């Protein structure tokens, strides 16, 4: 038996108006949440989430995410942009679930681009698989500064491009620790790829970090740096009064006028 349902024109118009009102309300709520920084935006049919800088908050990432850095307020200035950053005296944890990829783009004009930065006196844990595309005159792939710990667990791919022309002021660093900090990297892969016109290149910098340690436990660690111009310095590992440990397979490949 076939059941026939009749919808009168008036009912259809009322339902259409009701749906329109609901969509308008949802749109207003979404805009309010975005303005308040409460949530990110889902694009591409729900497969990829877009976010600004993840800063001073715990987060569990359950779907692929694209981060476009929009916060440059780190270390007392306003032109040091980062994809993931921590500035507090507390513990912050960002976890991307298994199978999830987080891609980040950080661009700074007349400033610094950083992938991950921890500059408070707390602990920053970043777990999962991440890639960072950094572009600025001065670049830091991973930076830890100021009596704290930075723990990375997963696969990390860092591609840094610097247009810096002044080797005295423009510096590109893959991983660095300063002022009483420890960095531990665990996982299958750490891949750092640096290209610059004429900035100074440092693959790993463990400087002014008396008694502290950077430990690379990744199964495969690759640090590649290419300087296109001439007259600058390219250094693989720079350490002073500190310890840098490499466990696993390590490749450090430097190409520059002075190595």
Regions found by a protein language model. Name each.
Residues 1-43:
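Bacterial Sec-dependent N-terminal signal peptides
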Residues 49-259:
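Surface-exposed loop/turn motifs in large extracellular/passenger domains
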């Amino acid at each position: 038996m076939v059941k026939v349902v009749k919808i009168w024109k008036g009912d259809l118009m009322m339902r259409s108006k009701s749906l329109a009102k609901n969509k308008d309300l949802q749109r207003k709520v979404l805009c309010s949440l975005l303005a308040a920084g409460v949530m990110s935006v889902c694009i591409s049919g729900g497969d990829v989430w877009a976010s600004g800088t993840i800063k001073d908050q715990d987060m569990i990432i359950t779907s692929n995410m694209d981060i476009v850095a929009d916060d440059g307020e780190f270390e007392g200035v306003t032109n040091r942009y980062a994809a993931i950053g921590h500035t507090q005296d507390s513990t912050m944890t960002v976890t991307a679930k298994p199978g999830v990829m987080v891609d980040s783009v950080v661009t700074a004009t007349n400033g610094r681009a950083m992938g991950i930065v921890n500059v408070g006196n707390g602990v920053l844990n970043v777990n999962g698989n991440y890639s960072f595309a950094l572009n600025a005159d001065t670049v830091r792939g991973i930076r830890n500064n100021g009596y704290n710990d930075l723990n990375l667990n997963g696969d990390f791919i860092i591609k840094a491009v610097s247009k810096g022309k002044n080797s005295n002021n423009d510096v590109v660093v893959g991983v660095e620790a300063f002022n009483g900090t420890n960095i531990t990297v665990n996982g299958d892969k750490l891949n750092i790829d640096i290209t610059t016109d004429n900035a100074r290149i440092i693959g790993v910098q463990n400087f002014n970090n008396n008694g502290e340690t950077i430990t690379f436990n990744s199964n495969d660690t690759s640090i590649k740096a290419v300087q296109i111009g001439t007259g600058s310095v390219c250094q693989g590992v720079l350490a002073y009064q500190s310890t840098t440990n490499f466990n696993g397979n390590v490749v450090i490949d430097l190409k520059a006028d002075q190595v």
